[in-house]
């Protein structure tokens, strides 16, 4: 049995376990996938930044007469500060991941191992859920601000601050676009993660086939000797 194991490792040590010298050559399909991920990562950065800027700078002033003025800014609705914070975190994270993906176009295995793949997978999943939750809660608050809610004596805020509501709404739309991009990015991170385990299973399958073929050859030689 030890002889078979030695044969297996001697056969696999060449083209299978030891990559060729030109290890940075990326297959065409894999390269297209990485380019798509780079585009999506930087798209998330743009959408998240636009959302944070639009919501964070939303403000308005209404003159009620008699020297009375009321002001509105993004802290008026409690969900907006949360959205701005999530947008900022998502933009920074996506920028770092976008740079990593861009470098991976030229260096095949840069910054990619199982530990990092699991970390990226968990972060992508968590941020996708968080940005979607933040955008959804903002959308609900925006609807109440537009339509009002008599049960809670919530007035139609947008009736007084049209520009404020317009900028907040634009920021909310960009947040949803960022969330949509994160859904696709999360799918890609799942693919990258489990592909690492798939390669390991492929090596094991090849080793098993080599062992079987060697055992069959030895039996044939024994029968021929008899």
Swiss-Prot record:
Positions in the Cytoplasmic compartment: 1-37, 100-114, 192-226
Protein name as catalogued: CASP-like protein 2BC1
Main subcellular localisation: membrane
Membrane topology classification: Multi-pass membrane protein
Subunit structure: Homodimer and heterodimers.
Alphabetical list of Pfam families matching this protein: CASP_dom
Domain of life: Eukaryota
Any one GO CC term of the record: plasma membrane
Lineage: Eukaryota, Viridiplantae, Streptophyta, Embryophyta, Tracheophyta
Keyword annotations: Cell membrane, Membrane, Transmembrane, Transmembrane helix
Extracellular side: 59-78, 136-170
Segments crossing the lipid bilayer: 38-58, 79-99, 115-135, 171-191
Family recorded in the similarity comment: Belongs to the Casparian strip membrane proteins (CASP) family.
Compartments it resides in: Cell membrane
Organism: Picea sitchensis (Sitka spruce)
């Amino acid at each position: 049995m030890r002889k078979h194991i030695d044969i297996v490792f001697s056969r696999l040590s060449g083209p299978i376990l030891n990559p060729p010298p030109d290890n940075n050559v990326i297959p065409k399909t894999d390269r297209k996938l990485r380019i798509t991920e780079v585009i999506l990562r930087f798209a998330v950065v743009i959408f998240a930044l636009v959302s944070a800027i639009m919501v964070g700078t939303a403000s308005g002033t209404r003159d009620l007469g008699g020297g009375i003025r009321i002001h509105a800014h993004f802290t008026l609705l409690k969900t907006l500060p949360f959205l701005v914070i999530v947008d900022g975190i998502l933009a920074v994270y996506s920028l770092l991941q976008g740079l990593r993906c861009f470098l991976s176009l030229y260096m095949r295995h840069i910054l990619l191992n199982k530990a990092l793949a699991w970390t990226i997978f968990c972060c992508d999943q968590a941020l996708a859920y968080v940005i979607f939750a933040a955008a959804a809660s903002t959308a609900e608050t925006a609807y109440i601000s537009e339509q009002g809610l008599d049960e809670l004596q919530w007035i139609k805020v947008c009736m007084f601050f049209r520009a404020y509501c317009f900028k907040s709404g634009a920021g909310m739309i960009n947040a949803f676009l960022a969330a949509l991009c994160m859904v696709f990015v999360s799918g890609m991170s799942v693919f990258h993660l489990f592909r690492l385990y798939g390669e390991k299973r492929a090596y094991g399958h090849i080793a098993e086939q080599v062992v079987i073929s060697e055992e069959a050859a030895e039996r044939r030689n024994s029968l021929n000797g008899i």
